[in-house]
Amino acid sequence: MPSRRHALVLQDRRAVRIVALVLLALAAAYQCFWRIADENIGGDESTYVRAGFAYVHGAFDQNREHPPTAKYLFGLAQLVGGEGATAPRVLVSALVVLGAAVMFVWLRAEVGFWAGWTAAALWTLTPRGGSGARLDRVALLDPVMVFFALAALFAVWTWTRTGRWWWLPLSAVLMAASVTSKASTLVLVPVFLLAPLLFRQWRRLVVGGVVWAVVFTVTVVALYAPMGIRSAVLYMLAFQEGQNENGHLAVIAGQTHQFAPWWGNWWFLAQGVGLPVLVVLAAGVLLAVVVRPDRLVVFLAAPLLLLVAFYSVAAKIALPTYYSAWTPWIVLLAAVGLGRLAVLRPRPLTGALAALLVVVALVGSIPTARAVWQTRPEGVARLLPLLRSEGIRDGRIFFGAITPSDYDQYVGARGVRDVDDAPFEAIVVGRDQRFPLPQEVTDLLRDERSSFERVRLDRIVVWIPDGEIERDADGELDVR
């Protein structure tokens, strides 16, 4: 009888786990893919998508300031799914789901089923703001870089744990794909020596390190070869050095910075994930460090510390998407911490507390789920249909308080931001304080308010004149 009861308990437990996985898969599919084609196309995304399409057709002159691999994949996706941003977006979201699978398999083996499930849930469902409803629903380089780095570190850990030789070269190939998607993860290369060090596998450290380095180098060269590796790398280094020296305008905590403060990417992290999720992640990481820290915790903390140091100290700029490089390691550590909390005594209490923290994070994801549900073209994406309905089919459009990358792909050469380019058929005003309105435009909108129809399109305002906006001999703007 006891054995039969035990079998029924195991069967019930298996059923609960299957249901949990199915529910997570459905929620992840929704969060990652629902209305994925309806997001506005950002400037960087448009650049990478166009460059990828050019690369697979043999033209490598675009976007040489970044490595090519992610753009190769974007180009291949367009060959399969059609030209444009949708197919690359589907690819990026698929990599997010694959990353969740890697996390689940990794932590399920090392900590337990629910730790793996928690990592996958935190990775696929929680907010990551910075571009669109979630920054890994658009075709940016960062999510591709992150996936390959995550898979590479999982592979080298598995090689160390199992001794199966083929995991080692696979890890090197995956890491080469990460570095040649975006170079930031180059700082993680020392971590690949850490795994055999942690297990005191000295022979594997020496022999495996040499094999890994050779495979990594050969793969990097092969991936860069179509671009011309020497010229491409030199151009990339010169560009990145110039950007670090000259800075990059960013609005952080309400202030415009040319050179970001060291905490800039931390601020974007807090804004991107939201307070409830941030608290849960911080608690989970703290628990991982405090409750039975082991080799796995050290191995996961190493890439987090290296990337935080790079983005907080070495890099002089901060952008809303940069923190995404840290998030897989934060998520993994948090899941480890919550998983180990759940098995402390008294288990009913600690298990309930761990479950409560996971629920808080999932509840904190509801705004992202709502944003995904409500995703549609907005702002500048709706501008040209509005102007056509007003009878404006050509002519220049003046843009102020809005970054050029937001409108270039929608209006092309019609979009200008210099009053010397008058006449204009309309004025579009955004909210980006990095690009303030010229005084001439401010004066025109104040003094000749009655000459304009004012239409709000989400976060922009379109001023449609009852004539044409021209510049007179005194440099003033008038509606004529």
Language-model-detected regions and their locations in the chain:
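Transmembrane-helix motifs of polytopic, lipid-linked glycan transferases
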Residues: 22, 26, 86, 90-111, ...
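Hydrophobic/aromatic-rich transmembrane helices and adjacent perimembrane loops
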Residues: 136, 142-145, 187, 274-275, ...
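Short periplasmic/luminal acceptor-recognition loop of GT-C membrane glycosyltransferases, typified by
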Residues: 373-380, 388-436, 460-464
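Transmembrane alpha-helix segments characteristic
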Residues: 23-27, 173-175, 213-214, 280-283, ...
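Membrane-interface transmembrane helices that cradle and orient dolichyl/undecaprenyl
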Residues: 110, 150-167, 178, 197, ...
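Membrane-interface helix-loop-helix junctions at transmembrane boundaries of multi-pass membrane enzymes
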Residues: 10-15, 108-109, 163-164, 200-210, ...
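Transmembrane-lumen/periplasm boundary regions of multi-pass, lipid-linked membrane glycan transferases
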Residues: 189-290
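Transmembrane alpha-helical segments
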Residues: 337, 351-377
